[in-house]
């Protein structure tokens, strides 16, 4: 059985790591490069960096941060936010990222998924999905709707349909974020995670809501996710990556304990 990945997520704004609840009330919690180094040394399998306001503010890429991270850590990392073109993808990969995450830009221009996969390989293209629970209706039969621009804009797109479409277009992985659960630390949206995981064949990363090790266990077992994104539970020192992995290992979830 493939090992399950534990992936710290660093939301970056103006070159600093921030954290909020449901994409709001963000506070500064540190330097992203230094935090990445700490998590790398603690045993993270990968790290994700999101420039959380680049798409909304139509700003450029955080290339300087990417370069510094690439010089500091030696595990895969992905970068999202502000990536609108294949040229942006190339520049970010050349700066040292292993993967590119597209979210708002892919919803507005789905061809960026197929173009990126063709040029760089599907393994480099991650679809970020920000999802809200809504009333089921004709356009949203799953009851989960895609939102973009940091949760500001509802798109009238069904999350399950979009996950399948992104896979068809060539995405190699999905990072599935529940905005309803984001930063609340009460657990991932297991229903959403399982729905997407069972209906695509590419890896799914559960995101939004981790507060205790049991939450990761539930996402990786009941939710059938391939990986789990964590933020608040390690950013604020409530848990360690080593402690989380030990908890999972003791309960039969395959994780990489040591390099």
UniProtKB/Swiss-Prot annotation:
Keywords: Amino-acid biosynthesis, Cytoplasm, Histidine biosynthesis, Lyase. GO terms for biological process: L-histidine biosynthetic process. CDD domains: HisF. It is an enzyme of class 4 (lyase). One of its GO terms (cellular component) is cytoplasm. It is found in: Cytoplasm. It catalyses: 5-[(5-phospho-1-deoxy-D-ribulos-1-ylimino)methylamino]-1-(5-phospho-beta-D-ribosyl)imidazole-4-carboxamide + L-glutamine = D-erythro-1-(imidazol-4-yl)glycerol 3-phosphate + 5-amino-1-(5-phospho-beta-D-ribosyl)imidazole-4-carboxamide + L-glutamate + H(+). The active site is at residues 11, 130. One of its GO terms (molecular function) is imidazoleglycerol-phosphate synthase activity. It comes from the Bacteria. Pathway: Amino-acid biosynthesis; L-histidine biosynthesis; L-histidine from 5-phospho-alpha-D-ribose 1-diphosphate: step 5/9. Gene3D superfamilies: Aldolase class I (3.20.20.70). Its EC number is 4.3.2.10. Its main location: cytoplasm. Pfam families: His_biosynth. IGPS catalyzes the conversion of PRFAR and glutamine to IGP, AICAR and glutamate. The HisF subunit catalyzes the cyclization activity that produces IGP and AICAR from PRFAR using the ammonia provided by the HisH subunit. Heterodimer of HisH and HisF. Belongs to the HisA/HisF family. HAMAP family: HisF. This is Imidazole glycerol phosphate synthase subunit HisF. The gene is hisF.
């Amino acid at each position: 059985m493939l090992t399950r990945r534990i992936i710290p997520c660093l939301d970056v704004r103006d070159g600093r790591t921030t954290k909020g609840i449901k994409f709001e009330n963000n506070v500064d919690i540190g330097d992203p490069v230094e935090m990445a180094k700490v998590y790398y040394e603690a045993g993270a399998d990968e790290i994700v960096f999101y420039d959380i306001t680049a798409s909304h503010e139509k700003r450029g890429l955080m290339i300087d941060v990417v370069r510094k991270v690439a010089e500091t850590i030696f595990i895969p990392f992905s970068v999202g936010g502000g990536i609108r073109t294949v040229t942006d993808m190339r520049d970010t990969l050349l700066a040292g990222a292993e993967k590119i995450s597209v979210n708002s830009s892919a919803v507005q221009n789905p061809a960026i998924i197929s173009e990126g996969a063709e040029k760089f390989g599907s393994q480099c293209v991650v679809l970020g999905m920000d999802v809200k629970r809504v009333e089921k209706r004709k356009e949203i039969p799953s009851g989960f709707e895609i939102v973009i621009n940091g949760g500001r804009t509802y798109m009238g797109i069904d999350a399950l349909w979009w996950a399948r479409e992104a896979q068809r277009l060539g995405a190699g992985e999905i990072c599935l974020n529940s905005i309803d659960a984001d930063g609340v630390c009460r657990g991932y949206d297991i229903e959403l995670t399982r729905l997407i995981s069972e209906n695509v064949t590419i890896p799914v990363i559960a995101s939004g809501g981790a507060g205790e090790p049991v939450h990761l266990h539930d996402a990786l077992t009941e939710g059938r996710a391939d990986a789990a994104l964590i933020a608040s539970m390690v950013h604020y020192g409530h848990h360690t990556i080593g402690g989380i992995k030990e908890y999972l290992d003791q309960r039969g979830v395959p994780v990489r304990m040591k390099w």
